[in-house]
């Protein structure tokens, strides 16, 4: 059933508002996926805070104009699904990568991360980016290491003195 003009404008507005608040967008061709596979993809996307939208290419191009997601224009062809992530730049890539492990019919065409286009062959690199919580944990570990070493060094001196005195007494 064809969409009327008002419905098309509503879709463009929804996708545009979604694109404006997203830090990354993924474009994948879903040709050959069954309904069950598509449902699994959508549920894994929901778990990862990724919004998936199936949109006609002409409407997607109109919606992505003047947003950071505009960089994916070149790959908007064929039956596509757009994945938007508002929090984690690597979330869309991780969802697509994990889904492709079991379903070879999903073909990732490219990713847009902070206004930069990333080719599909670099999906693994983006998917391996740490999440915000992981990055904070790594940073805190790196910051605490010198402090822990200093504390161990300061504690070691009295321990050595005690051992020397104990050895002399024996």
Swiss-Prot record:
One of its GO terms (molecular function) is large ribosomal subunit rRNA binding. Pfam families: Ribosomal_L10. Keywords: Ribonucleoprotein, Ribosomal protein, RNA-binding, rRNA-binding. It comes from the Bacteria. One of its GO terms (cellular component) is ribosome. Part of the ribosomal stalk of the 50S ribosomal subunit. The N-terminus interacts with L11 and the large rRNA to form the base of the stalk. The C-terminus forms an elongated spine to which L12 dimers bind in a sequential fashion forming a multimeric L10(L12)X complex. Forms part of the ribosomal stalk, playing a central role in the interaction of the ribosome with GTP-bound translation factors. PANTHER family: 39S RIBOSOMAL PROTEIN L10, MITOCHONDRIAL. Belongs to the universal ribosomal protein uL10 family. This is Large ribosomal subunit protein uL10. It comes from Ruthia magnifica subsp. Calyptogena magnifica.
């Amino acid at each position: 059933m064809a969409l009327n003009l008002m419905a098309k404008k509503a879709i463009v507005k929804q996708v545009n508002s979604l694109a404006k608040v997203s830090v990354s967008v993924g474009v994948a061709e879903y040709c050959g996926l069954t309904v069950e596979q598509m449902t699994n993809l959508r549920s894994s996307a929901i778990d990862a805070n990724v919004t998936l939208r199936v949109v006609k290419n002409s409407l997607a191009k109109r919606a992505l104009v003047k947003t950071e997601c505009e960089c994916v224009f070149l790959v908007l062809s064929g039956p596509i699904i757009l994945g938007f992530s508002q929090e984690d730049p690597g979330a869309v890539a991780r969802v697509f990568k994990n889904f492709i492990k079991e379903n070879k019919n999903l073909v990732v065409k490219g990713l847009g991360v902070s206004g930069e286009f990333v080719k599909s062959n670099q999906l693994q690199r983006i998917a391996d980016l740490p999440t915000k919580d992981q990055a904070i944990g790594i940073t805190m570990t790196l910051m605490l290491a010198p402090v822990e070493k200093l504390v161990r060094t300061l504690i070691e001196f009295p321990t050595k003195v005690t051992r020397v005195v104990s050895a002399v007494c024996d």
